Amino acid sequence: MASIIARVGNSRRLNAPLPPWAHSMLRSLGRSLGPIMASMADRNMKLFSGRVVPAQGEETFENWLTQVNGVLPDWNMSEEEKLKRLMKTLRGPAREVMRVLQATNPNLSVADFLRAMKLVFGESESSVTAHGKFFNTLQAQGEKASLYVIRLEVQLQNAIQAGIIAEKDANRTRLQQLLLGGELSRDLRLRLKDFLRMYANEQERLPNFLELIRMVREEEDWDDAFIKRKRPKRSESMVERAVSPVAFQGSPPIVIGSADCNVIEIDDTLDDSDEDVILVESQDPPLPSWGAPPLRDRARPQDEVLVIDSPHNSRAQFPSTSGGSGYKNNGPGEMRRARKRKHTIRCSYCGEEGHSKETCDNESDKAQVFENLIITLQELTHTEMERSRVAPGEYNDFSEPL
């Protein structure tokens, strides 16, 4: 026997095909060792009696059920043989329950037997509780739809075990509750509604739990990819706007008319180009008549505008004067109005208010200007001398001759 095993091992190491006699020998060993392995597994299974306090060597119902569910997939036998093996693991009241079930239902299956054992010995929920938990299971805020479907499936299986929902109606009930309590995209919601409408009489063709999970996950992956594609586009557009010189280009000076006298109009908008616009009006502007157009719409020749550019401005850097209407049009349909700040303009040549030296009519008569200045200085000097002659506390009657 040892030589045969050695030859089989050497042939496998050399990747050579096994001879026909080796295959027949392995099948014989499998048939002979199968019952031995099964009996060894049966000996290792714990017992369940259904008593409140388990005896030595016995398990609680939950542990026994977990053990049975673990070995059932390895039992390649008929339903009758499986029930016989399960009978060997029962004692006391649990064994009597199984005998009653077999007597009342000769065609009892393993699934029906386990369901009956859960109802008798398990801690199952009442039908009212299971019904309420399932139909009140809603998607939480921030929860993914796929996680909600998994959480909903747990409550659905509990409701099926409690007997309030038939297993054949599970697909339809799952879809209806998902549409009611889930936050789905518009496309996925329409697809699921179409399924319910088309297969209303063919519930077996509705998507089951795994198919529904796949549909929801595909929709979530598509949404995530779409959001990731959109975010770089938005950031790129913001960067382009940030580096674009057009976004920071200063606006031209804005001049408007006003009925107030001697006002300065300065544009203090956010995109200020450091240019001040001064509007100077005459002392006595004419009153508008009822038939005349509004002041802001007509040109006023008596209005004078002084535009002062900042040193940093790229345009002409010298003051200029112009007459015009009260609004500046920067483009088709674009009219803007600046804020007003009142300030009195005084001419440095003639000393009069209401105009500047650039527009002074007396600019050519400089001799008269100097003469006026000399007279003013003499008057101030004479007044100061008169005050110095009067001692503190004395009364001087200026009506008497000195």
From Swiss-Prot:
Residues 311-322 have a biased composition (Polar residues). Residues 308-341 are annotated as: Disordered. It comes from the Eukaryota. The keyword Ubl conjugation does not apply. A zinc finger (CCHC-type) spans 345-362. GO terms for molecular function: nucleic acid binding; zinc ion binding. Disulfide bonds: none annotated. InterPro entries: PNMA, PNMA_C, Znf_CCHC_sf. It holds the Pfam family PNMA. One of its GO terms (cellular component) is nucleus. Keywords: Metal-binding, Transcription, Transcription regulation, Zinc, Zinc-finger. SUPFAM superfamilies: Retrovirus zinc finger-like domains. Interacts with SMAD1 and CREB-binding protein (CBP). Forms a protein-DNA complex through its association with SMAD1. Transcriptional coactivator in the bone morphogenetic protein (BMP)-signaling pathway. It positively modulates BMP signaling by interacting with SMAD1 and associating with CBP in the transcription complex. It contributes to the BMP-induced enhancement of cholinergic-neuron-specific gene expression. Belongs to the ZCCHC12 family. This is Zinc finger CCHC domain-containing protein 12. It comes from Homo sapiens. The lineage of its organism: Eukaryota, Metazoa, Chordata, Craniata, Vertebrata.
